[in-house]
Design a protein with these regions (language model features):
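Conserved alpha/beta enzyme-core scaffold
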Residues: 1-123
Length: 123
């Protein structure tokens, strides 16, 4: 049975998100990010999230909002250079971080969508 992917608002879109989930968050830089859904996740207080995204936002915008409230336990990303809170949490060991090249990130996301168990890239 097909899933209805049309929702009325961010609250409805985030209803199925709970503690410990892995979320792939869209956008490039600060453009095209799901701002309303991120705000809703902050409001809901879900925690221990693993976030997969091109970037980590900035201190007061994008995924930076979830980092400020310490709702992210692991970040898988290719660029994180503009977020001071991210840097603080990473250096203190509060945040698990997996930095990967942008092309590898895109390929891993594509492979996951295809159900491929592995991809091979040069070392």
């Amino acid at each position: 049975m097909p899933i209805n992917k049309v929702v009325k608002n961010a609250e409805e879109a985030c209803n199925g998100i709970s503690d410990g989930m892995t979320l792939m968050v869209g956008g490039f830089g600060l453009c095209g990010i799901p701002e309303n859904c991120i705000t809703e996740l902050v409001r809901k207080g879900v925690k221990n999230l693993t976030c997969i995204s091109n970037n980590a936002g900035v201190d007061d915008f994008g995924l930076g909002l979830l980092l400020q409230t310490k709702q992210v336990k692991k970040m898988i990303s290719s660029y994180v250079g503009e977020n001071d809170e991210f840097e603080r949490q990473m250096l203190s060991g509060e945040l698990e971080v997996e930095l990967i090249p942008q092309g590898t990130l895109a390929t891993r996301c594509m492979a996951a969508g295809y159900g491929m168990p592995a991809i091979y890239t040069p070392a």
